[in-house]
Structures are given as structure tokens and as C-alpha cells.
Amino acid sequence: MTRTVGSTAADTGARLRQAALQLFARHGYAAVSMRQIAAEIGVQVGGLYNHIPDKQTLLFRLLSEHMAELLEAVEAAEIPAEPLPALEAFTRFHIRHHAARPEQVFISYMELRNLSPENFALLEAQRQDYEARLSAILERGAAAGVMQVEDARMATMAIIAMLTGVNTWFRETGRLSLGQVEEVYWGMVRRMVAA
Amino acid sequence: MTRTVGSTAADTGARLRQAALQLFARHGYAAVSMRQIAAEIGVQVGGLYNHIPDKQTLLFRLLSEHMAELLEAVEAAEIPAEPLPALEAFTRFHIRHHAARPEQVFISYMELRNLSPENFALLEAQRQDYEARLSAILERGAAAGVMQVEDARMATMAIIAMLTGVNTWFRETGRLSLGQVEEVYWGMVRRMVAA
């Protein structure tokens, strides 16, 4: 019995996150009420508060879980130690991971302005943890003389922006497969830091 | 007398756009009412309708004027004909132009989803007009053998994403001047298409 109740609660929690994600992505955080989210998943608005104390916490959890999932996934991707193979693995990982989560990526950028200062600081720490992995690859590559990197921080931001930008134009029904996109982007990233 | 009335109307129109831009950037289009915009500039909501028929038209004009201004500015930048100097001039122009307009750039990306299909199509045409200028430079460079470009469309999207991405991290009070940022980004763009 406890188990069934637990499963149902977990299920409602998951549907709540999914509904909030879609409503925030479509209309924006500020325009969506807890009442609308409750209606979307077919529960009373009071029932939501068993799962989440308020809308700000809901937004923060969505963004923070997106970053936690990214950090776990990059860990699981087993990026090699050698700088150039590491950069290739990171490039391909970043494109694939983000292309599979367009709504999370969109609200992660768009709704930063709606986080409380405390929540924004927590999210920034997660983001910097991810960015630091790419910066470390570039610094190792520059130190080993296999990459030219004037400024590891700017190169990190440039590479992440160009890779995440794939989400703005890539369509699965388009002329190119994601594998072809990865290939061309890896060529551009490799040249961008060519020693 | 006509002249004074005309100037006042133009002034209200400009203040209306500025207020809408800031409110949309802060709260999102869907969360902002015409009443709030009117309150922000100190007029009755009925007075807004002398300037703009509805909120959708207001959003479209903001985004469309941003693109029109971009197209005029790139024209005025007198990009040279030679491919490599053209790419350098385009890179520097794009960073400078966008860094000076963070709110317009932000809502131009974020509020695309709130345009009507007709307005979206009009804006897309303007955007493609701009992107085509960069694609043409890359194609000329590849044809002349001074650039390596596997896919001019993807290289265009990659370069624009990385350059516009400067807006997400650059602060005028930071460790770098915009001139230094331009310099490092031009180095990365040049290598990205190195033949």
C-alpha cells in the first residue's frame, strides 16, 4: 500500500514537472499559474502543494535538475584524457545531449531572469561546474601545444554557444542527420583551436 | 501647431516602444498587459491605441524594427568585397551591434514563439536576409580557396550563435573591453574557416 501511494506520488511529481516544463516553454514562467499547471495534470491546485511549496521552487527544480542531469551525463560520457580526443567527445556529447532536450534548454536560458538571487547563484555554480570541464580541456590542450587558445574562458563560451545554437535550427526532419551535424561542428571546433 | 502635435505623437510612440521592450524583456510578452505599458509611460490605455492596434503588432514592430536596424547597420558598415577582410568586418560588426542592444537581442530570440504565423514568416525573411550576407562571404571565401567551409549554412549558424553569445556573458565593467573580445573572437572565427 505504501508502495502504491509512493509510486502515485512520484508519478504525479513527474507529470507536474512535465506539465510545468511545457507550459513555461510555451507561455513563459510569469504568465503561467499554479492553477493552470494543476488543471493540465487533472488535480486540484491544493494537491500541487504536496509536491512543491511554490512556483519559484518548481522553476528552480526544473532548471537545477536539467543541470544535474547534464553533469551526470557528461560524467557518464567518459571524456578521454588526451586534449584533442577530449574536445571531440565533449563536442559530440554537448550537441547530442542538448538536441534531445529542446524545451529544457530553452527555459534554462530564458527563465534565468525569473530565479530568485539565491536560486540563480546555485544554478550558476552548476553551470560553471560544467563549463569548467571544457575550459580544463582547452587549457590542457594549450599547455601540451596541441591547441591555440588565447583565452580559455572566451573559447569555452564561444564553443558552448555555437554548439547549443544547433537547437535553434536543427530539425529531425531536415536535410541533415544529427550525426552529420556533429561531424561538421567537430571540424569547425577543431580548427577554431588549431595550434 | 501641427508640428508640435506630430513631435509629441512621435515621442509617445518612442516611449511606448521603449517601455514595451523593457517590460517584455523583464516579464515576458505573455505576462505584460497593454494596461501595464500605458501605466509605465503615464497615459490612459485607450491612448495607446492611437499608436498601435494591439499587443501582437507591438511585439512584431519591436522585433521587425530591430531586424530592419540590423540590416541598415550592416549595409552602412561597408563590408569589403575580399572574403577574409569581409569576414573580419562582419565579425566585429555583429559583436558590436548586438552588445549595444541586449534587450532587443534577448526578446528577439525569446519571443519568436509569441508571433503570429504571418508575423513570424515576415521576421524570418528579414533574418534570412541578414544570414545570407554571412553565407555569401563564406561561399566566396571557399570558392577563392581562402576558406575551408564544409557547409556554408551550418558555418553561418555556428558563427552567428557564437558571436551573439557574447551578450550572455560580456559586462562592460568586466576584465575585458569589447575591443579585446572582438579581437579574440575574430581569431577564433578566422581559424574556424582556415583553409
Tell me what each language-model feature is.
Chain A
Residues 1-11, 150:
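N-terminal intrinsically disordered/low-complexity leader segments
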Residues 15, 19, 23-57, 61:
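Helix-turn-helix
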Residues 19-23, 93, 97, 162:
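Short amphipathic alpha-helical elements of helix-turn-helix/winged-helix folds
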Residues 52, 109-115:
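Short helix-capping/turn signature of helix-turn-helix
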Residues 61, 75-103, 155-159:
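Hydrophobic alpha-helical connector segments
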Residues 65-71, 118-143, 153-157, 183:
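Amphipathic alpha-helical packing segments from all-alpha helical-bundle domains
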Residues 105-110, 120-121, 142-188:
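Hydrophobic/aromatic-rich alpha-helical bundle segments in the mid-to-C-terminal region
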